[in-house]
Amino acid sequence: MKKMNLLVMSLVSAAALSFTSCSDSEDLANDNAGQAKADGFYMTLTVQSPNASGTRTSVLDPTEFATADEAAIKKGTLYLVDANGKIAFSENLSNLDWKGQTDKNESSKKDGNKTFKIEVKDVHAGNTYKVYFKAGDQLPTAEMNFKPTLSNIFATDKKFATPFAEAENFAMFNQNDSQVDGNGYTVTFSKANNNEANPAKVNYNGVAGSPIKVERVVARIDAPVNKSTQILASYPKNASEALKVAIDDAKEKVDNIELVDYAVANLANQSYVMQTWNNNQLSLPANTEYTQKGTEFGDKYFYKDNKFFNNEPVNYVFENNSTDNPTTMYFEYKVTLKDMANADFKEGANAGTFYRYNNVIYTSFDQIIKDYKDVPNFFGGKDAKTMKTELDNAINDDTKLSEFRKTYNIEVFKGGKTYYKHVIKDNHINGIIQRNSIYRLNINNIFNVGAQVPNGEPTENDYYYINVTVTVNPWVLNTEDVDLQ
């Protein structure tokens, strides 16, 4: 269940709109619309814009304003739904110029305030209708169907949810969680509402004129923020003796470790138009599939280069609650060692390559073999020159390189690259990421050199490689501080 202090900026746009009916439809952009009394009913709808703390009851600090592209609403659709779930009336709106607050200056917010004349053939006096507002012009997989709302699904064939996060055209819909009932907005028409001076108003929890709170359908994952370029001297909690040896060795030999790229894995391909919950658990549509899956990054020895690392400033994704395919961030770092004087790879395309054997870092096979000179048949009895030649023949072919690693049980950090991964989580709801939230990972500490490939297995547990801190915002900002090992 969403908590009070987890709430996301559910509304990024704003407007006070009056919807009126008459005997003939008119252009919605007509500023003179609604001036004459007409047959039918008048109705006022308000879409509330957020203030600095968002539109929900409470938002965690720190919060973060949307960008202008994320805050603007240029298009939208109003739905009135009868007691049987039938859409009694809908109207597409365009040429809107509403926008939510984008900085501390409240003048950055522009609330819409227009009167529209709309023909309302199918609403009747005395009847109550549920009211929904969809921002953006994106369409669900089938016609909007409120019998039940669960049938309304957004889907994409792209890796990310970018079609639903277009500049000035973000898909948004009624907020629906423990704080706000997305199905709770209603309007009831009476004969008195056939006059523009007395329009029907949207009701929520008995309050007439209530604004409809909407939220973005997508979540935002920002590029990670690296705050550490050195191996930390201290040990993570509950570190084993073997891990302490590895950390001490890395601390002694690593001069610098720099974040160079990242990737996001396990991207859901669909989402409900309105956020949906089942027994207080976030629900995803049936048969949700995932692109850029974690398994597609390779295995514990093999790096499968599918060009997933993108270094984009932001990524927009659908929410996710999968335990089998959790939304995960992979980090790629470049390690620079203090002493490469006698290294096997000092020059060329693979310069900086080093090894780790039995938790100890080496720059040459000669160093390793000297340390294990008393071990019978070490490396199958092969000398350093033979091992180097064998690696030279494998290092530029990821399949051959993975076989080399596996055969000799040695970690080869090609080009000095090392990898970490971390499951992205909401600050207060375990195991999910949810819409209208920003997820930003801060790398605070690095304890050890990571894995040789993205899916390399740590010798301890996941904490052995990474510790992260997350924040969420208005957008709700989830930041997670991460320690890498």
Spans of model-derived segments:
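Charged, compositionally biased non-catalytic regions
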Residues: 6, 23-25
